[in-house]
Amino acid sequence: MSQTSRSSGELTESSGASGSVAVATGPVKLNSVHGYVVSGTSTQCVIYDNTAASGTIVARMLIDSSDIDGVGPIAAITGKSMEFDMHGVYCKKGIFAVITTPTGSGNHGFTIEYE
């Protein structure tokens, strides 16, 4: 039997209250986190086992925007993406995500897959 995952849909710093989003409540398995940056500044997603932005951090993804848009030694890069395979990490209270852009805004986002 195949596993069926649910997705948070695209999350950005504009999602929820300033990038703070309750993705799921109650016991769930965290399968993966995907993120991308196409332009702008670096971006970060912090995922908590909770229903708020506190408690146990189960993942922290930071995608650096250096070398994008022809800046830096590798001028051909037009975007970056990253995936964390979380292998079904058990989140007892739920999944809460906080997305931030430390130095401004840009074209970026995250998705969280869970079951």
Where are these regions (language model features)?
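Beta-strand-rich, repetitive solenoid scaffolds
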Residues: 47-48, 60-64, 85, 98-100, ...
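Exposed aromatic-hydrophobic patches
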Residues: 79-87
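C-terminal interaction-tip segments
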Residues: 1-27, 99-115
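Local beta-strand/beta-hairpin segments that build beta-sheet-rich folds
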Residues: 8, 22-25, 54-74
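Short, surface-exposed beta-strand/strand-loop-strand elements in extracellular ectodomains
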Residues: 40-61, 109
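Noncatalytic modules at the cell exterior or secretory-pathway interfaces
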Residues: 31-33, 88-102
